[in-house]
Amino acid sequence: MTEIEFVGYSAVHPSDFIYDVPNGFTGYLLLLFDSPSELLIDGRLMRTAANSAILYTPGSRIYYRAAGEEYRNDWIRFRSDHSFVKLFPLTNTPFPVTDPEYCHQLFKLLTWESAFFSSESEANITHLLRVLFSKLREGIQNESPG
């Protein structure tokens, strides 16, 4: 089962934007960065490029901020017991996204589906998330050597 807590796309924040949740959330947070960003990973501040993503796992520290310019992202806070989420190959570490526009469109669809609930919404949300996670895995696989 999957439950979307909050979801949004095309979020825009000023160049001094900071988001800090020291103890994380009880669910997952998936971010798709549309601008360069700075993240705190294992106690180190690191810069990530636009067209990157990160999947924060439940209870993980969440800290990200603008990197000196306007900050833009798509995001979803959710709970899921599906294996495509629980077994995602890279968590709490940024990774490149090979088709950010495609993923952006999926965030739009997830937002619309969660906002206009119908009898098919739960199944539709699961299918959309499955496709999104499949596309995100492509970026990880393309980055891996060999």
Language-model features: locations:
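An amphipathic alpha-helical interaction segment
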Residues: 76, 81, 100-146
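Short, surface-exposed, charged/polar-biased interaction segments
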Residues: 28, 51, 72, 97, ...
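A short, structured beta-strand-centered segment in the mid-to-C-terminal lobe
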Residues: 91-99
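N-terminal regulatory/effector-sensing and dimerization cores
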Residues: 2-92
